[in-house]
């Protein structure tokens, strides 16, 4: 029922990932039996409390309108880059980062890109272009139920 409400609850997908991961783990443990009981993590309980406390005041908009600016980002195993309005920046990954999965690197590149241009994009609607379809999906859906590490970014 939570996912059915997403069109009417702005940022709703940000607040159900732990519950969804708990459900997936429980179904795996019970071999797909929905009639079994499951444990709910403290994080999932926090998400449920948030939903219960805001159910009367949630809303969403039909459209966020046209973007004020467009930012392009890219990442590889060696580093990341981005451009905004003809200005480019980027950097190499440190050793620990370069060993991460490419999905994590692409999301991190978007985060670094936004941080790099904070002064230029503050209070603006930014369209982000990425060549990585999995990350585009992850951003559009406000996270993933498959990688807690990406959600923490």
Predicted regions and their residues:
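Mobile genetic element proteins and their domesticated derivatives, centered on retroelements
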Residues: 19, 72-74, 82-83, 109-113, ...
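Short coil/turn segments at beta-strand junctions that form active-site/ligand-binding loops
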Residues: 67, 122-125
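Helix C-cap/alpha-to-beta connector motif
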Residues: 117-121
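Eukaryotic intrinsically disordered and solvent-exposed regulatory patches
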Residues: 54-59, 68, 113-115
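Two-metal-ion RNase H-like nuclease active-site motif
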Residues: 64-77
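A short, polar/acidic, helix/strand-boundary loop motif
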Residues: 85-108, 116, 132-151
